[in-house]
Amino acid sequence: MKNKKFLNSFKYAFNGIITSFKTEKNMKFHILMMVLVIIAGILLKISKIEWIICVILFTLVISAELINTAIETIVDMITMEKNEKAKIAKDVAAGAVLVNAIGSAIIGLIIFIPKIINIL
């Protein structure tokens, strides 16, 4: 019985990821950026440490977007009317994603720009 509950928790988690991908344009954008970084990493032969950094950053951005989606969904479930506190909650959650994405982009530039310059 416990194994079934454990396996179901993975099923529910994957359903959440898939739902977020299907319904959120920003999640699609983050996944696209992740795929492009993976391709660039392969082509530019980034180091093992650089791969680890990229995977950590992928995890942070995707996790932040999933949490943002959950917060937005809960807020919308509670009220669809204009409400300043609901707006603050949604804006702050979106801001957390933006901070992660900007930080990840900066680190990505630090990793990839020298490699691109070396090719030129």
PLM-predicted stretches and their roles:
Residues 1-2, 83, 89, 104:
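A contiguous, well-structured "functional interface" segment within a domain
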Residues 2-15, 19-70, 78, 96-120:
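Hydrophobic alpha-helical transmembrane segments
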